[in-house]
């Protein structure tokens, strides 16, 4: 972040950790497929610097490769993180998406089902979207971005 935010005009006043944390409401991170795994890990490690997250076609692998086989354990970790770091009050939003024809859809669907079964993950903080007929491809990614970015930066949540 310091390399980009130090060169371009952003909402951070400077590149100190304090300034980057203070400007977290103006920062999002998203990734597709293995980038989705990266997005979940960004949520786990960098919630102080980023408010909005867009994992597309993938689940959290906090507990090792193919973390989708440890769905409950990963969601337990995320839920505890939200509670311990007071993220409900500080603000966070996850737009999790996958296509109904995506070859890795079970990872996302299983994780979403577990998250949505818990009262911690309300629609104010977590949305799961399935693109009808969507595949593991750029067309799906474009739709996910089109839908998520206004929710992130449309004014009400910022």
Q: Could you say what each language-model-derived stretch is?
A:
Residues 1-158:
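Non-catalytic cap/lid and distal C-terminal segments of serine-dependent acyl enzymes
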């Amino acid at each position: 972040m310091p390399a980009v935010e130090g060169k371009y005009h952003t909402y951070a006043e400077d590149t100190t950790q304090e300034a980057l944390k203070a400007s977290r409401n103006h920062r999002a991170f998203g990734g597709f497929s293995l980038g989705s795994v990266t997005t979940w890990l960004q949520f786990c490690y960098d919630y102080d610097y980023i408010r909005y997250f867009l994992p597309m076609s993938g689940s959290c692998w906090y507990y090792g490769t193919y973390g989708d086989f440890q769905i409950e354990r990963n969601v337990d970790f995320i839920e505890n993180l939200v509670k311990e770091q007071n993220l409900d009050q500080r603000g966070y939003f996850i737009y999790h998406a996958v296509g109904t024809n995506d070859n890795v859809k079970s990872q996302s669907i299983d994780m979403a089902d577990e998250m949505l079964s818990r009262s911690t993950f309300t629609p104010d903080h977590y949305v799961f979207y399935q693109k009808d007929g969507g595949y593991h491809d750029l067309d799906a990614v474009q739709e996910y971005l089109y839908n998520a970015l206004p929710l992130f930066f449309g004014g009400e949540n910022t």
